[in-house]
């Protein structure tokens, strides 16, 4: 049995030029596992705490030397000599050492980086691909699937400096036969969308997640531009390709109203649910994330009752990858899907528990990046190793996004005939 002989933390940069945490876990046989913690822009209020230094003279207060110090000090001392393959024991030990509800003492960024680095070291020690090790940890050895990519090709909201209120407009290549075919389809649509926007005299600069970020007349205008790009790429909208939204509605919710400032419109919960329902009737939208504010559970129930039978309703800020909150949502019939983000909860073990709870209740689980990413591609292995069926990792440019797609291509090649891609069957309706 290999043992942990050293743990090192360091401050590195994420895709927005902000500091984040990287950890190395070293084993007594020379193996090293390394992992980086991502960081979000539109965040749920109940996410685990990302520990920042607050020193305004350094990185405008966003340094992570405190979190790094926690890795190099108390976390290292705690885990030296431990078995890296006992993921639950490692994660529970760090959670207990932290002792807070939201990992505020050590920092979710510190705990997560070590948690993932340990998993990578353990996978190497057992001569397993990371996705296979994750499947074993998940209690589903050998059960894999390639995820349908939800490609964010127009950015708005907190992810772009434009007038578009909805944060993400995505395409899903549900008609593809394989993941690699689906990735090609999405890439072709992305390039055709650039041409469509250019022809309209619109900006083709990209946002945080690599999608285009033009000023558009309305959210419906964004959907129309994508529909045109799909057609120009030679695909049939609604059959080959479907659409998805991430409203990130908490970002434009105030005093009980949903304010679409880009369109000069304001709605109550029922009105905004009807607005979204109307979009699903005019476009083949099969997934909507954070359609209402994270605290507006009554509004979420209205939306679920209106379109939940036909449309995947994903809780991101709503559930924050937290089993306690998810359990309550399941009991109340709120949404029908959970977005899975490692750093919302802060450990691999708790992430797997959230996926398992969702699946047991008939909810789908969508594996997701954050807007602040690195070259770390662990979420690709997580999607395959849990057979989640869906992944959100941005657009088809920026290496922080493409690194995940490229890792999925490698995994598909390794799995060969076992690389099952289910397409439309991964979604409701």
UniProtKB/Swiss-Prot annotation:
It catalyses: (2R)-2-phosphoglycerate = phosphoenolpyruvate + H2O. Its main location: cytoplasm. Binds a second Mg(2+) ion via substrate during catalysis. GO terms for molecular function: magnesium ion binding; phosphopyruvate hydratase activity. Its cofactor is Mg(2+). It comes from the Bacteria. GO terms for cellular component: cell surface; extracellular region; phosphopyruvate hydratase complex. Mg(2+) binds at residues 246, 289, 316. (2R)-2-phosphoglycerate binds at residues 167, 341, 370-371, 392. It is found in: Cytoplasm; Secreted; Cell surface. Pathway: Carbohydrate degradation; glycolysis; pyruvate from D-glyceraldehyde 3-phosphate: step 4/5. One of its GO terms (biological process) is glycolytic process. Its EC number is 4.2.1.11. InterPro entries: Enolase (IPR000941), Enolase-like_C_sf (IPR036849), Enolase-like_N (IPR029017), Enolase_C (IPR020810), Enolase_CS (IPR020809), Enolase_N (IPR020811). It is an enzyme of class 4 (lyase). The keyword Lyase applies. Keywords: Cytoplasm, Glycolysis, Lyase, Magnesium, Metal-binding, Secreted. The active site is at residues 209, 341. SUPFAM superfamilies: Enolase C-terminal domain-like, Enolase N-terminal domain-like. Component of the RNA degradosome, a multiprotein complex involved in RNA processing and mRNA degradation. Belongs to the enolase family. Catalyzes the reversible conversion of 2-phosphoglycerate (2-PG) into phosphoenolpyruvate (PEP). It is essential for the degradation of carbohydrates via glycolysis. NCBIfam families: eno (TIGR01060). This is Enolase. It comes from Pseudomonas putida (strain W619). The lineage of its organism: Bacteria, Pseudomonadati, Pseudomonadota, Gammaproteobacteria, Pseudomonadales.
């Amino acid at each position: 049995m290999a043992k942990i002989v050293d743990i090192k933390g360091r401050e590195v940069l994420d895709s927005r030029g902000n500091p984040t945490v990287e950890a190395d876990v070293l084993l007594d046989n020379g193996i090293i596992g390394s992992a980086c913690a991502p960081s979000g822009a539109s965040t749920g209020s109940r996410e685990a705490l990302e520990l920042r230094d607050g020193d305004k003279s350094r990185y405008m207060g966003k340094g992570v030397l405190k979190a790094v110090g926690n890795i190099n000090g108390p976390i290292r001392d705690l885990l030296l000599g431990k078995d890296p393959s006992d993921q639950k024991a490692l994660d529970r030990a760090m959670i207990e050492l932290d002792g807070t509800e939201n990992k505020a003492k050590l920092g979710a960024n510190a705990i997560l980086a070590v948690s993932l680095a340990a998993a990578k070291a353990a996978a190497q020690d057992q001569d397993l691909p990371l996705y296979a090790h994750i499947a074993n940890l998940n209690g589903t050895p050998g059960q894999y699937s390639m995820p349908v990519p939800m490609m964010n090709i127009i950015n708005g909201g907190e992810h772009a400096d434009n007038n578009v209120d909805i944060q993400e407009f995505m395409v899903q290549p549900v008609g593809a036969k394989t993941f690699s075919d689906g990735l090609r389809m999405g890439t072709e649509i992305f390039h055709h969308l650039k041409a469509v926007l250019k022809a309209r005299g619109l900006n083709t600069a990209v946002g945080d997640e690599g999608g285009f970020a033009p000023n558009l007349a309305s959210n419906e205008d964004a959907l129309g531009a994508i529909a045109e790009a799909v057609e120009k790429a030679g695909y049939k909208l609604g059959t080959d390709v479907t659409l998805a939204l991430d409203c990130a509605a908490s970002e434009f919710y105030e005093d009980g109203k949903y304010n679409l400032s880009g369109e000069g419109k304001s709605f109550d919960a029922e009105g905004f649910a009807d607005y979204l329902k109307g979009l699903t009737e005019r476009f083949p939208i099969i997934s909507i994330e954070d359609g209402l504010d994270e605290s507006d559970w009554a509004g979420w129930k209205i939306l679920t009752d209106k379109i939940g039978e036909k449309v995947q309703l994903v809780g991101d800020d709503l559930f924050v990858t937290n089993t306690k909150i998810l359990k309550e949502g399941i009991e109340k019939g709120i949404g029908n899907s959970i977005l899975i983000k490692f750093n919302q909860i802060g450990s691999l073990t708790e992430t797997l528990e959230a996926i398992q709870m969702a699946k047991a209740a008939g909810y789908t689980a969508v594996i997701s990046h954050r807007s602040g990413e690195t070259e770390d591609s662990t979420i690709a292995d997580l999607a395959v190793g849990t057979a989640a069926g869906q992944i959100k990792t941005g657009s088809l440019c920026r290496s922080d996004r493409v690194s995940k797609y490229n890792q999925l291509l490698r995994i598909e090649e390794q799995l060969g005939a076992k690389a099952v891609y289910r397409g439309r069957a991964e979604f409701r309706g």
